[in-house]
Regions:
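Blade-loop segments of beta-propeller domains
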Residues: 75-147
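Short, conserved, GDST-rich strand-edge loop motifs in beta-rich repeat architectures
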Residues: 41, 49-57, 156-165, 203-226, ...
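Asp-box/WD-like beta-propeller blade repeats and closely related beta-sheet repeat scaffolds
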Residues: 121-196
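Beta-propeller domains
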Residues: 97, 185, 194-322
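Beta-rich, blade/repeat-based domains predominating
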Residues: 31-38, 85-98, 136-152, 185-199, ...
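Short loop/turn segments immediately following beta-strands, especially the blade-tip
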Residues: 66-74, 115-125, 234-237, 276-285, ...
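Beta-strand-rich domains and repeat architectures in extracellular enzymes and scaffolds
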Residues: 29-68, 74-108
Length: 411
């Protein structure tokens, strides 16, 4: 899995690496991760990408280590793969601990957690712990997103016992000791917090029993409140408000980054829309539709720029990536699009807001193209998007067999 880079391309990349200083007045911040995590404040050098074999049972899930250092001679190459040691996990989302020393990786189907040491040697992460009995420990199934809070990890769990019914949040120490489960009234997908307001919001999708079936057998009537967002008291881990929309499957959510910002956004997959949540003076939240992303988009992920000027939406069904201008938070506008990128799913924006990496596998049961890859979009100072023609890792032609790349983190 190598990029075909000419000597000229490498030379240009190295030259570009030396010019990554931000222009005066621009903001740098790592986005779309917990505010408790020690932030990356310099250009990325390595990417960790959590992936699974394209064919069920075709091998173990793995953490790919990718060189993304523009000044490196191995830029754009998969340096190694760290195996999970088991099959059938359905590798999905990953998250750092607050001190950025460990990476937690969740598995949708097997209810396992994999903990990697990424601090001792960042270029050579090591699998140091596997938690096998998550369902028995927590009473919850379908682990989705590991999210850092001080000294602990909260994992959004989609469903209850046996993959059915509402899920909740499972709380662990950074080392993997189970603390408690916190029941939800829907199927938690993602978590975002705003510590200054003592508020946490979780979005929703569907239970584990759904995605483990072929798409033709999915039954939305078995889903619990998939059109809701839950507002929690962060310290008490208690639900204090339910935000409801007519559209179902409220996936990725992002809180505005600016200190004191009382608003944020999430996407509705079934409703092809962006929604805005906003904290009012009385402590409750307003919730309204902010924009339609277009019929047939099938929004899968939502990311933001470090300066709160742009949102990025991946349209999994329509094969495009959208940039939305949110400089006026109450009146957001479509700013730019890239089309023809096959089933884009997870994205990651760099600390300087100039690069957006994306993968193109969602879940084994709904992927519709076998052209699996990880690609890069360059973001101009004007917010315009341009697909980088020199950066593409073809996971469909991986040496050990085709693989589905899902979530990624930079270091």
């Amino acid at each position: 899995m190598r990029l075909r880079l000419s000597k000229l391309t490498v030379a240009l990349a190295i030259a570009f690496a030396s010019s990554l200083a931000l222009p005066p007045g621009e903001i740098a911040a790592e986005t779309c991760i917990s505010p408790y995590i020690k932030s990356l404040t310099q250009p990325e050098k390595v990417m960790y990408l959590w992936a699974l074999p394209a064919t069920p049972g075709g091998g173990e899930d793995f953490l790919a280590v990718i060189d993304v250092n523009l000044a490196s001679a191995t830029y754009g190459q998969v340096l190694k793969k760290v195996g999970a040691g088991s099959v059938g996990n359905e590798a999905h989302h990953i998250g750092y601990t607050d001190d950025r020393t460990k990476l937690w990786a969740a598995s949708l189907n097997s209810d396992r957690f994999f903990i990697f040491d990424v601090a001792t040697d960042p270029m050579n992460p090591k699998l140091i712990k596997v938690i096998d009995n998550v369902g028995k420990l927590t009473g919850l199934t379908g682990p989705h997103t590991p999210y850092a809070i001080p000294g602990r990890i909260l994992v959004s769990m989609a469903s209850g016992a046996n993959g059915k019914g509402p899920g909740g949040l499972a709380e662990f120490t950074n080392d993997g000791k189970f603390i408690a489960s916190h029941a939800a009234t829907n199927h938690p997908y993602e978590t975002v917090v705003k510590p200054e307001f003592n508020r946490m919001i979780t979005s929703a999708w569907f239970p584990q029993e759904t995605w483990m079936k072929p798409l033709s057998q999915w039954d939305p009537s078995t889903w619990s409140n998939p059109n809701t967002m839950l507002v929690w008291d962060l310290k008490e881990r208690k639900i204090i408000q339910t935000l409801t929309a007519p559209d179902a499957v409220m996936l990725a959510a992002r809180w505005a980054l600016k200190p004191g910002a009382k608003y944020g956004y999430n996407i509705s997959n079934a409703g092809n829309s962006i929604w805005m949540f906003k904290l009012k003076d009385d402590g409750t939240f307003d919730y309204r539709k902010a924009a339609d992303v277009g019929a047939g988009c099938g929004p899968a992920d939502l990311r933001q720029s470090p300066d709160d000027k742009y949102l990025y939406v991946s349209c999994f069904v329509r094969s495009e990536i959208q940039a939305w201008d949110i400089s006026d938070p109450e009146n957001i506008k479509l700013h730019d699009t890239i089309q023809g990128v096959v089933q884009p799913n997870m994205m990651h924006v760099t600390y300087d807001g100039r690069r957006l990496y994306f993968t193109n596998s969602a879940i084994s049961s709904i992927d519709y193209s076998p052209r699996y890859s990880m690609q890069l979009v360059q973001i101009g100072h004007d917010g315009r998007l341009k697909l980088d023609p020199n950066f593409k890792i073809d996971f469909a032609k991986a040496p050990a067999g085709p693989a589905r790349p899902h979530d990624m983190l930079l270091n």
